[in-house]
């Protein structure tokens, strides 16, 4: 059962002093001012458990601020203002800190200095998630005293963790065409055909009638997700950010990175993913032993396949489509891929069948649009095949 403590950042220094916890391990203490900005990291208690970005940045206050703000809902979330108004929070960071920045990605949380809370009492892995639908859709069903991991979910689209019979799942909506949820499902099916390590996605209809994507949790009470941005800060000074990233992974003894990363870049090339930033891929780590297990499964592929184009331009050159994170265009980024990936001969036929089956469920996807998507995707698949053939 959750212990509810009212959030108050107006009680002087003591109320603004927090312990950054890693499960039940105190990591450091820090003072936050009335804007919830870290002004001083006062003590490093367990340096081995510091967030990884604090190990690659010299300024510990800036690094910790980055870490805390990453766990808050971004300003680009379309319903953020509605959430802040409903929960009487001044900004996203305050909203996140009310639930101690508990989340379902990593095992860090912020504990008020005089609190007797512990991980076993409040973590979201061992206790039911009870929350308002407002995170996902319009709703008047709100309990502002709930401790929720949903106030610490990074991402621009409306989304929330829910407790299902199948376990904990992330539900995520789309934008004006609502194409992203369908893209998530299609791309995860592609990954299965390609034998890429990935998170499986399904479509789900919520109470409002809206169709969203649904995927299982890929962390656990023992395994946490560390996004790639934690080690990306030094990469900005390097011409070859791809190799610099691999070097950083070697430095931190993260295994089996290149093959998985190459598969991710090939998939992004194929699907024209413009959203593979350093938060959308990363690593799995045992939070007790601090051992890295490898790359996290491929996830978050909604911003693909012309998701943001009301009308697809068949004459737009493929080399103009943007990419992340190592190069600004896919045609340049794909050149980093040297792993001999194999594409099944049957994939073209299978992909066409999957597109017919999946996108037919979206009333915004007209027959003409689907035909254009299939034609362009088939062309893109031929281009990827041609590139990979040269590697053999």
Protein language model features and the residues they cover:
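Phosphate/dinucleotide-binding and metal-coordinating scaffold of catalytic cores
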Residues: 2-266, 270-272, 284-392
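Catalytic-loop of the protein kinase fold
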Residues: 273, 278
């Amino acid at each position: 059962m959750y212990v509810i403590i009212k959030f108050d950042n107006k009680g002087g220094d003591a109320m603004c002093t927090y312990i950054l916890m890693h499960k039940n391990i105190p990591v450091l203490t820090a003072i936050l001012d009335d804007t919830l900005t870290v002004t001083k990291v006062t003590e490093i208690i367990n340096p081995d458990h510091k967030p990884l970005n604090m190990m690659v940045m010299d300024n510990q206050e800036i690094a910790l601020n980055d870490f805390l703000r990453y766990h808050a809902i971004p300003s680009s979330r379309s319903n953020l203002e509605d959430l802040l108004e409903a929960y009487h929070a001044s900004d996203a960071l305050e909203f996140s800190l009310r639930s101690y920045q508990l989340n379902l990605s990593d095992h860090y949380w912020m504990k008020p200095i005089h609190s007797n809370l512990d991980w076993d009492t409040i973590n979201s892995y061992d206790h039911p998630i009870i929350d308002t639908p407002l995170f996902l859709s319009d709703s008047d069903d709100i309990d502002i005293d709930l401790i929720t991991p949903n106030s610490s979910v990074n991402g621009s689209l409306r989304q929330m963790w829910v407790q299902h019979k199948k376990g904990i799942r992330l539900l995520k909506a789309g934008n004006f065409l609502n194409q992203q949820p369908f893209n998530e499902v299609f791309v995860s099916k592609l990954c299965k055909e390609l034998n890429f390590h990935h998170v499986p996605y399904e479509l789900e209809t919520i109470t409002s009638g809206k169709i969203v994507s649904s995927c299982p949790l890929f962390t656990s009470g023992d395994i946490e997700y560390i996004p790639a941005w934690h080690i990306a800060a030094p990469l900005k000074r390097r011409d070859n950010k791809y190799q610099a990233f691999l070097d950083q992974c070697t430095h931190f003894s993260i295994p089996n990175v290149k093959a998985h990363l190459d598969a991710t870049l090939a998939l992004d090339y194929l699907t024209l993913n413009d959203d593979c930033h350093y938060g959308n891929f990363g690593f799995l780590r045992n939070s007790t032993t601090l051992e890295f297990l490898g790359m996290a499964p491929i996830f978050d592929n909604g911003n693909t396949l012309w998701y943001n184009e009301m009308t697809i331009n068949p004459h737009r050159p493929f080399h103009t489509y943007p990419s992340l994170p190592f190069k600004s265009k896919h045609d340049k980024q794909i050149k980093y891929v040297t792993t001999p990936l194999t594409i099944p001969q049957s994939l073209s036929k299978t992909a066409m069948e999957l597109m017919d089956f999946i996108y037919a469920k979206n009333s915004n996807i007209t027959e003409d649009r689907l035909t254009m998507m299939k034609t362009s995707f088939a062309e893109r698949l031929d281009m990827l095949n041609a590139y990979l053939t040269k590697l053999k």
